[in-house]
Each structure stands twice: as C-alpha cells, then as structure tokens.
C-alpha cells in the first residue's frame, strides 16, 4: 500500500491487515503501551472542508504514535487558497512532510496530489470516497461479530462517498452488501461496475424495508448537508421514507447493529430514539476512527 485514496486501492489481505493492526494498537492504547512508531515523523493535515472526527482523530493518533501532526486550513492558511497551483503545493509539502492527509472535494485533485507529492497521501474525505470511515465501520463490525465474512450489510441513504466506500470495502471484506438509495442518488458508475462482479453478494434497491430484511448491520449517513437551501428542500422530498426508524429496524435481525458516520441529523436520516438505542455502537465506531487511522499511518510510515 503506497497511499490510501479509495477502498479499491486495497486488496482483501491489505484490508484485513489494517484491521488487525488497528486492533493491536487499540489494545496497546488501553494498556498504556502505545509504541512510538512515528517518532521523528511529520504528518500534514490539510483540510479544505470542516471536520470534527477526522481532524481530531488524526491529530491525536499522530501524537500517540510519537509523531508531529500539523493542521492547516487549505482555504485560508495556504497559498493554494489564493490560487497557487495544486501541483506546486504537492511538491512543496512532499519535501517537508513524511505523509499528507487531505480532506477536499474532488477525488481527481487528491489523486493528482498523490502522484506529485512523493510521500504517502491519505484521503480524509472527498465527494467520492471516505475510506478511513469505512475502515472504522468494518473494525466495529468485526469487533462485535468476530468476522466480516458473510455478514449482511445494508446502507440506506445518498449514494455518495460513504456508499461508494462501503460497497467496495464490504465486498472486499467478504460481506453481502445492499445499498438502498432513492432514484437519482445512485452510487458512482465505476463502483457499481465493481460491485456487480460479485453477483448475488450485491444488491442496489430503492425500498428501505426490502433492503434491511435480515440485515446484520444497517448503516446510514446524513443526506441533508445544506439546510435552508432549495437543494435541501428537494432532498427532504426525495428522501421521504428513507429515515432509519425503530419500525424499519424491526425488519433487520433482532441483534442487528446500526452505524452512523456522524454528524447525525435526528429526524432526517435517523430517528432520535433509534440513534440513542444504538449510541454505544455509533460512538465506538467514532472511536475506531482513531485506531484504524493509526494503523494506516503505521503501515505507511513504519512498515508494519
């Protein structure tokens, strides 16, 4: 693994290795024996979008592993926000830092940056992919279930970055994946081409009740990210009936897990009651962002 830009960068073996290392690092942190695997290493945390979990978990993770993490707002603190070409920023930061984490908009910009930087680059979220979040989801499921193989995962929501990454990651991990989206909100075409190679292990549906039937894990994410706008009003109409409620969860297995990448918009993609019922799973999922990202850093920079 040279970079982590999207889930399809990983082989099944590499994916499971990340989870294995994450579990080891989590146990070591709980025991107070975290190794200084990044001693003398520096990581640029470049963010073009706001962030709570991604920024803080990377900052804390780099620190816990003995490295230096520098946060920078790409829009207001770097010359790239004033028009400096991306290729120049990449070639400069690659000479200062051992690794760059970038949260940005366009996947093509991230991939161009990775080609030029000369150091490992990690996707902190683009409009196309959210691999760090999905690795945390898979870790959380494996901790609870003991295995990912054969588990039925149902994603309900917008077919954007979370759906794209969950589909690929779940299938690579040996899961059965169902994606439920309204018409007009399908996952990326290349992701669907990848998924259909897995035959009956993948289903794309528009009916949430059909999708959650006998699911081991249900995952949702916010789909109304610009409240008060015409786009928001359209989405509220289009996603009517896609809220994860207690009644919907009755169609899943009795012990089904429910995950949410956060932030959660209660009353939209998830009901407040269901969120609180599954809050421990959801916040364990959020905690596991720290551990999987430490694992990715340790693999890329310390050769684990």
Task: Specify the residue positions occupied by each region the protein language model found.
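Adenosine-phosphate binding glycine-rich loop
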Residues: 255-256, 261-304
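Rossmann-like adenosine-cofactor binding region
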Residues: 196-273
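Active-site-proximal loop->helix
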Residues: 70-93, 116, 166-169, 186-200
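Anion-binding alpha/beta catalytic cores of soluble intermediary-metabolism enzymes, centered on
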Residues: 81, 98-169, 260
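Active-site cofactor/substrate anionic-group-binding motifs, chiefly glycine-
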Residues: 42-43, 47-96
């Amino acid at each position: 693994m040279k970079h982590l830009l999207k889930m399809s960068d990983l082989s099944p073996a590499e994916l499971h290795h990340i989870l294995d290392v994450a579990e080891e690092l989590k146990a070591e942190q709980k025991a107070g024996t975290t190794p200084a695997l990044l001693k003398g290493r520096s990581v640029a945390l470049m963010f073009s979008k706001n962030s709570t979990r991604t920024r803080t978990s990377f900052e804390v993770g780099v620190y816990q592993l003995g490295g230096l993490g520098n946060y920078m707002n790409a829009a207001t603190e770097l010359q790239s926000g004033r028009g400096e070409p991306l290729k120049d920023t990449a070639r400069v930061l690659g000479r200062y830092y051992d690794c760059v984490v970038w949260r940005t908009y366009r996947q093509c910009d991230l991939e161009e940056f990775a080609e030029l930087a000369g150091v490992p680059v990690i996707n902190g979220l683009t409009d196309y992919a959210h691999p760090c979040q999905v690795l945390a989801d898979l870790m959380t499921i494996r901790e609870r279930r003991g295995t990912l193989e054969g588990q039925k995962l149902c994603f309900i929501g917008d077919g954007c970055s979370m759906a794209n990454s969950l589909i690929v990651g779940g299938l690579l991990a040996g899961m059965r994946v169902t994606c439920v989206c309204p018409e007009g909100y399908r996952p990326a075409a290349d992701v669907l081409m990848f998924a259909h190679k897995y035959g009956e292990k993948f289903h794309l549906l528009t009916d949430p009740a059909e999708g959650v039937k006998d699911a081991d894990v249900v995952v949702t994410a916010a789909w109304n990210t610009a409240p008060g706008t015409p786009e928001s009003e359209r989405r509220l109409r289009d996603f009517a009936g896609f809220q994860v409620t207690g009644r919907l969860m009755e169609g899943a297995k009795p012990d089904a897990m429910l995950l949410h990448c956060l932030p959660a918009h209660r009353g939209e993609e998830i009901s407040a009651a269901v969120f609180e019922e599954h809050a421990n799973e959801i916040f364990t999922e959020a905690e596991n962002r720290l551990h999987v990202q430490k694992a990715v850093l340790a693999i890329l920079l310390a050769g684990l």
